[in-house]
Amino acid sequence: MKYLKHLSDAADREAIKALHDERQTWVNQEKKGFLRYREPYLQLARFKADSINLENDVVTIGHGEQISHEEQAEIRQALRAYMPWRKGPFAVFGVDIDAEWRSERKWQRLEKHLPDLKGKVIADIGCNNGYYMFRMAAQEPAFVLGIEPSVQHYYCFKALEEMSGLTNLEIDLLGVEHLPLFTESFDVVFLMGIIYHRSAPIETLRAVLDSLKPGGTLILETQGIPGEQPYALFPDKTYAKVPGTYFVPSASCLINWMHKAGFIDVDLFCDHPMSPEEQRQTEWMEFESYKDFLDPENPELTLEGYPAPHRFFVKATKKM
C-alpha cells in the first residue's frame, strides 16, 4: 500500500488498511473467477519495458523489438484474457490494443482544463484499466490512486503497471462508497462515468468534496441528456441497454447538483453528443457497443425511447 503515506492525517488509515487486507484475502482466493485474471497478470508481470511513452494518444509500454516473436505472441494471448477492453488505446511490446472507447478523445477534451498535476496526489474513481492514470503520470504527479472494484480491471491495470515500471501509480479494490475514509487527502479527484450509477448523486458528490484538500479540484465526466431545464431522467430498467443507471441529468441539473453538494467555481467546459465513432466494437471488444443501444430508426433516441446521451465535462473546486 504505497499510497497510505500520501494521505492526510485526517484519513482513517486503520480502516483503509483493514479494508485493503479484507479485499486482498478475497481476491487471492484459488477460484476460477480470480485465477482467470490473476494467472495472465503473473505471466505479463515478468516482462519489463525498457521504455514507455505516456504523452501520446496511445499509451505505449515497451516495443516489439525488445522481445522475441514467441514472447510477443505470449503477451498478446495474456492481454486478451482481459477482454473486453473498454479503455484505450494501448501498445504493449508491439501489441496494439484498440479498445471500445476512444479514450484519447476524452483526454484531449479535458487535458487543457486540468490544474497542474505535477507533485499532486490524485484519485481516479472507477479507474478501469488505468488508461487515464497513465496519461496523468506523464505530468509527474506525486501519486495517483486508482479506485476500482472490478477484479478484471484490477489485474489488467496491475499487469500494465508492472510492465511499465512506474512507481507512482497504484490501484486498490475499493469503490466510491469508501471515499469517506479519505478525508482531505487528494489535490485532484477524477470522477468519470460514475455519477449516473449512483442512487444518491448529491451524497456521492459530497463524499468527493470531503476527500479533497481545501482548494482541491474535481474533474467530473458523465453521460447526460439534452435540454435547458434542470431535470434528470430516471429510467425504468436500463438506459441505452445499461442496467444500474439511476439519474441521467441535463447540464443545468448537473451544475445544480454540484452547487448543492458544496462545490464552487463550477465550470461545464464541454457538452457533446455521444457517437458510435467514439464507442464501438473492435477486435478487443467483440460485444454490442453504442450503435446497438440506439433506436435503429432514430439515432437521437435510445432503444428504450429515451433521449440519446450527451457527455458532459465539469471542473469544480473545493473552497479553501
UniProtKB/Swiss-Prot annotation:
EC number: 2.5.1.-
UniProt xrefs under InterPro entries: CmoB, Mo5U34_MeTrfas-like, SAM-dependent_MTases_sf
Molecular function as annotated in GO: transferase activity, transferring alkyl or aryl (other than methyl) groups
Keyword Transmembrane helix appears in the UniProt entry: no
Pfam name, any one: Methyltransf_9
Keyword Transferase annotated: yes
Catalytic activity reported: carboxy-S-adenosyl-L-methionine + 5-hydroxyuridine(34) in tRNA = 5-carboxymethoxyuridine(34) in tRNA + S-adenosyl-L-homocysteine + H(+)
Segments forming a coiled coil: none
Superkingdom of the source species: Bacteria
GO biological process, one term: tRNA wobble uridine modification
Gene3D superfamilies attached to this UniProt entry: Vaccinia Virus protein VP39 (3.40.50.150)
Record keywords: Transferase, tRNA processing
Binding positions (carboxy-S-adenosyl-L-methionine): 87, 101, 106, 126, 148-150, 176-177, 192, 196, 311
Subunit-structure text: Homotetramer.
Record family assignment: Belongs to the class I-like SAM-binding methyltransferase superfamily. CmoB family.
Protein's job: Catalyzes carboxymethyl transfer from carboxy-S-adenosyl-L-methionine (Cx-SAM) to 5-hydroxyuridine (ho5U) to form 5-carboxymethoxyuridine (cmo5U) at position 34 in tRNAs.
Name the record gives this protein: tRNA U34 carboxymethyltransferase
Native organism: Desulfotalea psychrophila (strain LSv54 / DSM 12343)
Gene symbol of the encoding locus: cmoB
